[in-house]
Amino acid sequence: MRVRVSLFVLAFAFVFATSAAAQQPEKGYWRAASRTAESITGDISFSGSKITIDFTSFLISPLRLLTPAEVSAAFDEAVDTAGNGQLYRGNIPASRRFLKKNTLCGTQDTQWMAIYVADRSLKVAFFSGDNAPLMTFEALQGSTDLCGTYTFVR
């Protein structure tokens, strides 16, 4: 009986751990892979409700899932192969300087962050502005709120 209970607890823990990881694929440490990431943010990490950039943590809260069409528009991914992404709300002050004294959004506070994880790659787009970004190709092409896109790898 004790072995059966132990197996049940072990199976429950495994299912819980794998479902939590599947719900937050961005969680963990990511190395800068694009030129923008290497020159502005450096490596980043996600842990629960925080993003850490250049050894400074900022609170973020998930708002909604991004559809494959929105991921395609934001990160130039093929719609038929893109998965879901995530839109986060946060506040990274414009006064916060990162690598080489760079900021994320110039003189604007960073308010929004879209992410997309594919295999061992993480793509992040930072946005300023009071309203959530409209994640369509047309809106993003003319957006003054899109601060930049970054690529990271594990």
Predicted segments with their positions:
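N-terminal secretory signal peptides that target proteins for export/translocation
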Residues: 1-3
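Short, solvent-exposed loop/hinge segments that bridge or flank secondary-structure elements
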Residues: 25-27, 31-64, 98-113
